[in-house]
Amino acid sequence: MEGTGKVKKYEVALFLKTGKAVNYTRIKKATDLKIEFNADVHEYDYIADVSPTSELEKYKPQITGLPLTMYREEPDFAMLWDLAYGLKVGGEAVGEMLLVYKFDEDAETTGQWKAWSAPATIIIKTLDAVEGKLEFDVQPRGTITQGTVTESGGNPTFQPAA
């Protein structure tokens, strides 16, 4: 990793694509973005050891409780409102997630950022009319593909790692 200093909030970018959309929509008007890694740790009590051993088996990252400020003119709200209003479930609630990490200083020279891509279930949780927020979760489905992203005109293009 190149560079120094604290990572800024705008350097972790969440993009979603739902339905028959061709391009990703960046989630811009959320006021929080926390990625929960959800480590799956198992304890094994091997007969040759005095104390049990903890083994990290896997991660199941997800984003929960993402509060989006509802601006009528914003594409991110329009996309999520379509899911909420339509009460979409099953396959209609599945989209594509692209999580782009724009804080590697090396990207300035390569024009590529590290990223994760995965199908994801988008779960609408709460519409708070008083606060003007729509809260939702993004839960990746299956394997998360690591790779890089280039951006042209605000549209990201994902390339899986070799």
What residues fall within each predicted segment?
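Short, low-complexity, polar/charged sequence segments that are solvent-exposed and flexible
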Residues: 84-90, 118-122, 156-160
